[in-house]
Amino acid sequence: MSKNIVSNFFKHIKLVSKHKWLVFKFSVKLGIPFRGLMHDLSKFSYDEFWESVKYYDGKVSPITKCKQENGYSKAWLHHKGRNKHHVQYWVDLGTKGVAPVIPYKYVVEMICDKLSASITYNGKNWTNSSEYEYWVKEKKRIIVNPKIENFLEEVFLNLKENGLEKILDKKYLKETYKKNCIDDKTEYYYEFKGEWKKVG
């Protein structure tokens, strides 16, 4: 085992631990301590852990690095199917265009996860705008029920304009979720029009 792998091993554990601690702190504040405690435990499974050590970067997710080099990540395929705080968990391309409204506790865990990852990877460069700017790009490449999209959009825009403490508020998130995801009775369907294209 090379020195680089050994170094990455400990750095990855430190990074994941920092991320989990922040998620737990946010989760406790928002009334879902159990979700914070159980958050991302699959990262310590063989399939996820060793790929993450191999592609550890410190500035971006190892999953992102692996995707950049290989076009896909086995760790991500394993992770998204076991963690309900990811929008990808709730998408089944074999269904007739229905993406469910993600339950409240998992969307709140998602917010905690996104905030923690953004703060962890951006470090001193993190600002109230960081997550909103990332979300604007991310929402273009994922499938998520528009009600959840509207909810996240409103929360991250509020973060950008008014700061972290304004959104780390249980009452605010419950009211915003209710407005966007429960009171809105609109039904949505998506059309998947994927097709293979030859490269080279």
Segments (PLM) and residue ranges:
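Metal-dependent phosphohydrolase cores
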Residues: 1-200
